[in-house]
């Protein structure tokens, strides 16, 4: 019943992982389903991850999306990690989605 969850009809939130760019891969998120033991882990070198639960669709809360990205509105904020793409420099970032079955302990 949190105000932001009601207003957005679920999650539509950007979570900051780091405050400056580096090649370091960080765990952005993990999802676990205890009945089957399925687990998904998201690793990235990008500075943020967006969590979205599709609240505006016909059947809200039937999906979840984890999008690695730069901070929202980055070009308007000089203190945010730069998302500028230049023709002389290759754009290289990495996001890894790994899946496993984890038995309960």
Regions found by a protein language model. Give the residues of each.
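Active-site pocket scaffolds in enzymes
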Residues: 1-105
């Amino acid at each position: 019943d949190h105000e932001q969850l009601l207003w957005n009809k679920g999650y539509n939130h950007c979570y900051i992982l780091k405050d400056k760019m580096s090649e370091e891969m960080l765990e952005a998120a993990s999802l676990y389903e205890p009945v089957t033991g399925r687990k998904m882990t998201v690793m990235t070198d990008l500075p943020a991850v967006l969590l979205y639960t599709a609240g505006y669709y016909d059947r809200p809360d039937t999906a979840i999306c984890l999008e690695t990205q730069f901070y929202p509105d980055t070009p308007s904020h000089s203190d945010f990690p730069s998302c500028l793409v230049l023709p002389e420099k290759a754009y290289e970032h990495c996001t890894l989605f790994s899946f496993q079955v984890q038995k309960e302990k």
